[in-house]
Amino acid sequence: MLTSPSSSSTYDPFSSNFSPSLTNAFSSSFTIPMGLKLSRRVTRARIFSRKIKDRSTLKVTCRRAHERVVEEEASTMTETKLFKVSSGEVSPLGVSQVDKGINFALFSQNATSVTLCLSLSQSGKDDTDDDGMIELVLDPSVNKTGDTWHICVEDLPLNNVLYGYRVDGPGEWQQGHRFDRSILLLDPYAKLVKGHSSFGDSSQKFAQFYGTYDFESSPFDWGDDYKFPNIPEKDLVIYEMNVRAFTADESSGMDPAIGGSYLGFIEKIPHLQDLGINAVELLPVFEFDELELQRRSNPRDHMVNTWGYSTVNFFAPMSRYASGEGDPIKASKEFKEMVKALHSAGIEVILDVVYNHTNEADDKYPYTTSFRGIDNKVYYMLDPNNQLLNFSGCGNTLNCNHPVVMELILDSLRHWVTEYHVDGFRFDLASVLCRATDGSPLSAPPLIRAIAKDSVLSRCKIIAEPWDCGGLYLVGKFPNWDRWAEWNGMYRDDVRRFIKGDSGMKGSFATRVSGSSDLYQVNQRKPYHGVNFVIAHDGFTLRDLVSYNFKHNEANGEGGNDGCNDNHSWNCGFEGETGDAHIKSLRTRQMKNFHLALMISQGTPMMLMGDEYGHTRYGNNNSYGHDTSLNNFQWKELDAKKQNHFRFFSEVIKFRHSHHVLKHENFLTQGEITWHEDNWDNSESKFLAFTLHDGIGGRDIYVAFNAHDYFVKALIPQPPPGKQWFRVADTNLESPDDFVREGVAGVADTYNVAPFSSILLQSK
């Protein structure tokens, strides 16, 4: 348990015997009391810092009331710095370059003291503590305005300075405070973060997170002909993916220096173009803590949080996704290069953002890195007993609708739009953002409205995951202000159940593929406000959905208690991998059925990375902690499936792009769709057919799904005058006959639709 130093303890900074005792790793740090209480004039502090291995005595001498000179008695001194400091500016929060120097500003409502810690080490090594840190104690009578602490330091380098804060305050845990001056804290507004250098290196699991800055590099060159794709929402096809997992596997053929990095991602953009998607939804790329599980009392050393839902900071790109070592300045530049390359390829960038919790866990497994130690009572939701509320399922819940936290989130979003040119955001567990500071649901959450109405964010796609771990399920009811789209969880469940052959699902399936009007039309929203998906990072992959009835999460080390138990999956007759040709053929059909259903549905489709070749996690439906082939894209598997599985997936996506009847702006009217069904009330009917009418060129589309385990003879309607039907897709056929872009003529008045298969016809 962490405890704060007693507020009654005293020390004499002018005593020759004074030697500060810091329990932080920075054993060589020393403190410079800023003598600003009697004068608002600037002060000078002469600081002799050196790389020490021993404990030398510090001798402090008072020269004037507003000036301190710190001389260090040591056998060797390697560097001398002269700093000039002033009270600083209250805004903006974080670090900024001002006329006088470098300004630092930090919010803390309940802190009683704040100390700025600086390291001028140019080594960039993880053992910065050996290089010593300079500590500047802020005087609240000079360096504080309202609840913001601030100081300006002159003569600092314009980059490669590491910094953090020590914050002290009331020590009463029962009052909701978690102050501990012994911990060096990361600035919540740090735009760049220096963590450990190597992704997943357990030897660095206790490495410090520092803020840093770069005011020296030239602005990134976006290019004179650069432009945003600006793809209409109705035209999006989203590809959910993990930056590291995309190229980390050796099968990617990457140089190890760029495998799993932003630059490695760029090398594989042609694959995304071949597939046909036009938007990537990146699993978290904010600086996150992948080693959180390895610090617990019974650590799971094999677990590395590769999904990234363990946010350390909301402004900085993940430094360990940079090429080579985890350099934050390089990470920022290479992230921009990735965005620029994606935009040049006509692909938008949507970030999966985690504003519902942070990496600081709970009071059982506390790991204070920033918010908790700066002002726990402001940044986190607390119950009436001042204990952490846990609507995120991760131990803490960010206090999103507190004015200060709300502004932090808005500033973060604006930063990613203006600095990194991203096109949109998917908000993880967004129902948390709809809760008041006491955790109660809000019908008109200030944060949700502010995001929707913000002028900087006006062109962005904003997508909610409309549920949380506290039971606030808002699918179809998420506050939207005509802006917010939603992950349509009901689409996932209903489509899974129909395709696998559950009874009584035909009506629900019809509602989902036609745009979920029951969820969105009633609230004056558009079909594209529903993001349709069958598979996402949570849960089974598409291949596992048709290969496993039960989750197999033993490798996670949680005794099978993690991951969802109700997956609406069907193993097609055998649990797991099999060599049975009949079962393998059935599984292939089912995967194609799911993909075809997704791409012909009204709304915005989203698919998961790897499903285009049939990636398996061997039944693990919660693989967040595996930095292995379990999550990594398998490029050799893609090569093996390029001419069949991948080809079908790609062709269906491109077919969607070229047919406006599959992506209506508004909900379908009677003249735009015909249902070929006369027994809607038959709960045992598992066959659905309909025609989408093209009122412009007469290129109607007929689609039929058969979820029975027997053939169904479908009666094919008459084509438009002067047209005939062409078979474009039949998931029962082998490649390349399963999808023929130009179509195959000769479709009769009836069509025998095979068990667990689907067809698509087009009139020409």
Curated annotation (Swiss-Prot):
Keyword Translocase: no
Catalyzed reactions per annotation: Hydrolysis of (1->6)-alpha-D-glucosidic branch linkages in glycogen, amylopectin and their beta-limit dextrins
Active site: D428, E465
EC number from the UniProt entry: 3.2.1.68
Domain of life according to the entry: Eukaryota
Compartments it resides in: Plastid, Chloroplast
Marked site (Transition state stabilizer) residue numbers: D538
SMART domains (UniProt xref): Aamy
Phenotype of the disrupted gene, per the record: Strong increase of the starch level in leaves at the end of both day and night periods, but no modification in water-soluble polysaccharides content. No alteration of the amylase-to-amylopectin ratio.
Transit peptide region: 1-70
Keyword Transmembrane: no
Comment field (misc): Double mutant shows that ISA3 and PU1 have redundant function for starch degradation.
Family (UniProt): Belongs to the glycosyl hydrolase 13 family.
Function field: Involved in starch catabolism. ISA3 removes different branches than ISA1-ISA2, namely short chains that prevent amylopectin crystallization. May be the debranching enzyme required to assist beta-amylases for starch degradation in leaves at night.
Protein name as it appears in the record: Isoamylase 3, chloroplastic
Organism: Arabidopsis thaliana (Mouse-ear cress)
